[in-house]
């Protein structure tokens, strides 16, 4: 009897915790001005007004602006920017890295991430809950996975700019930037990321050892 109760409980838990299946074939996000209520997600566009353009985006065709201190840019498309993704549990991003570019430690609380390198060399890694770091060098055509919620980073690892695309199993993965949480400036964040990635002893400009 106890075993039966446990089985029933597990079945109920899995059915509640899993994502719901789509109730219709498509559900492009409705424009903001048409939203009159708030839900966990985005309301669907009027079915009579859905077109093929709702499922196409050209926002990742061009490189992002890397003229900044980190010399990098991440362009993320969620269901808000790409209506056709709504209810599909997917999102996508493009990462552009200059020769010394970096995307410092951050996490996605609602999604895992699969990174696919299409140009250059990328040094990427993540830290698990045992504080163990997993890192590797990625070249064109290589794929690397960042588990859900774990801190991760990527750096340009070659002598030329690098480009990678990421795919997420959530239409809104969310981003937690460690530097912004603790008010650490970008210079220190960039140095810390490279120190952890290379395993070398580093010192920041004020002489404090990292």
Swiss-Prot record:
UniProt-annotated glycosylation sites, renumbered to this chain: 73
Keyword Transmembrane helix listed: no
Disulfide cysteine pairs (residue numbers): 27-44
Swiss-Prot/TrEMBL keywords: Apoplast, Disulfide bond, Glycoprotein, Manganese, Metal-binding, Secreted, Signal
Matches recorded under Pfam families: Cupin_1 (PF00190)
Main location as per UniProt: secreted
Endpoints of the signal sequence: 1-18
Domain of life: Eukaryota
Keyword Glycoprotein: yes
GO molecular function terms attached to this record: manganese ion binding
Residue ranges annotated for the Cupin type-1 domain, each copy included: 58-190
Gene Ontology CC entries for this record: apoplast
Residues that coordinate or bind Mn(2+): 106, 108, 113, 152
Localization: Secreted, Extracellular space, Apoplast
Family: Belongs to the germin family.
Function as written in the Swiss-Prot or TrEMBL entry: May play a role in plant defense. Probably has no oxalate oxidase activity even if the active site is conserved.
Subunit structure: Oligomer (believed to be a pentamer but probably hexamer).
Name this protein carries in UniProt: Germin-like protein subfamily 3 member 4
Species of origin: Arabidopsis thaliana
């Amino acid at each position: 009897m106890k075993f039966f109760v446990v089985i029933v409980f597990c079945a109920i838990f899995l059915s509640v915790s899993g994502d719901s299946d789509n109730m219709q074939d498509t559900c492009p996000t409705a424009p903001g001005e048409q939203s009159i209520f708030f839900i966990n997600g985005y309301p669907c566009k009027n079915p009579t007004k859905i077109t093929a353009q709702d499922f196409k985006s050209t926002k990742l065709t061009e490189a992002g602006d890397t003229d900044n201190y980190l010399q990098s840019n991440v362009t993320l498309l969620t269901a808000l920017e790409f209506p056709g993704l709504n209810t599909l549990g997917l999102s996508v991003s493009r990462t552009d890295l200059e020769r010394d570019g970096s995307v410092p430690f951050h996490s996605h609380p609602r999604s895992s991430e699969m990174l696919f390198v299409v140009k250059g060399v990328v040094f990427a890694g993540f830290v698990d809950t045992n504080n163990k770091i997993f890192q590797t060098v990625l070249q064109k055509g290589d794929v690397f996975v960042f588990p859900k919620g774990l801190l991760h980073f990527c750096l340009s690892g070659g002598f030329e700019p690098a480009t990678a695309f990421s795919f997420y199993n959530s239409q809104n993965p969310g981003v937690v930037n460690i530097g912004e949480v603790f008010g650490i400036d970008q210079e220190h964040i960039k140095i810390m990321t490279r120190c952890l990635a290379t395993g070398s002893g580093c010192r920041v400009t004020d002489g404090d050892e990292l």
